[in-house]
């Protein structure tokens, strides 16, 4: 689960990580009022959206008077950035910057550990820095039994700072960020940039946190911060019904039993020139109610023009699946072509049952079924 910058900064503040003065606003008038309350000369007006690239999209502006604050706030609040409408903005004190740094804790799948990543090249896309100047990146795996004790925090801090006073402040921030990362079950805690001001203060002027969805039940406070997209709402509904569902951008809706087969189905669709509309694993049940719910989930996506049902009968018998499909489609009214591939236990019986109903196009092999789906899509697109 992602959270907005202002929410991440609130969490950072509770852990003692220094952030600049800021205020959340929902209107241009509110932004001007907040500007007066803050009593600073210059502010950064930043769109609050759960996606990157807001600066390049014009979602971050600097202002130093009422007119500019109002104008920029109004403009940003009317924007949509990568499909996300901007409904709130963050007014942040624009601090003087002597240097910028990058610091984050994340999960490194290669080392199977929490990893600290630091760089003196802050304020930039860290992945771009890693590609172009990998020598500027410092990576350290963290032993979960030790964490980040004082001696390690100071060792890390002195790799970026020579002066003891600044290194001591950095060491404290490293420890506080690690504590927030662990206690909140985060998969990412990032400050980019962490700035050094001319007077020697360190401030997190941008903040990012991502949390493990599977651990949210332990954090009611974080659950309240969730702002799911429409796709995420559908995925949550599917999860409640026992499905694994992820919406995509294609036109061929997939209903499959088993995650591995679902991945293979999507690969086959791509191989033959199509695009899957979703990942949908309905598990091993042939229950008609489950099929109905899965179909309604697919058909809620208006981009779906063809449905590809791919079932491998292992413990689940194909004739039971066929009966479930027939019962389900007595209640589902749709003109969308339905391609069904049934193979495995009692596969012949299952296919024979479905062929008696002209509602389905039936196949035995995945290749045959995929070609049927692509051909049907071409006809629907004419």
Swiss-Prot record:
Entry keyword set: ATP-binding, Ligase, Magnesium, Metal-binding, Nucleotide-binding, Tricarboxylic acid cycle
Q: What class of enzyme is it?
A: ligase
Catalytic activity field: succinate + ATP + CoA = succinyl-CoA + ADP + phosphate; GTP + succinate + CoA = succinyl-CoA + GDP + phosphate
EC annotation from Swiss-Prot or TrEMBL: 6.2.1.5
Q: Which GO terms describe its cellular component?
A: cytosol; succinate-CoA ligase complex
Where does this protein hold substrate? 257, 314-316
What metabolic or biological pathway is this protein involved in?
Answer: Carbohydrate metabolism; tricarboxylic acid cycle; succinate from succinyl-CoA (ligase route): step 1/1
Q: Name one GO molecular function term.
A: ATP binding
Q: Which cofactor does it need?
A: Mg(2+)
Q: Where does ATP bind?
A: 46, 53-55, 95, 100
Any one Gene Ontology BP term: tricarboxylic acid cycle
How the protein assembles, per its UniProt entry?
Answer: Heterotetramer of two alpha and two beta subunits.
Functional description taken from the UniProt entry: Succinyl-CoA synthetase functions in the citric acid cycle (TCA), coupling the hydrolysis of succinyl-CoA to the synthesis of either ATP or GTP and thus represents the only step of substrate-level phosphorylation in the TCA. The beta subunit provides nucleotide specificity of the enzyme and binds the substrate succinate, while the binding sites for coenzyme A and phosphate are found in the alpha subunit.
Alphabetical list of HAMAP family matching this protein? Succ_CoA_beta
Q: What is this protein called?
A: Succinate--CoA ligase [ADP-forming] subunit beta
Which gene produces this protein? sucC
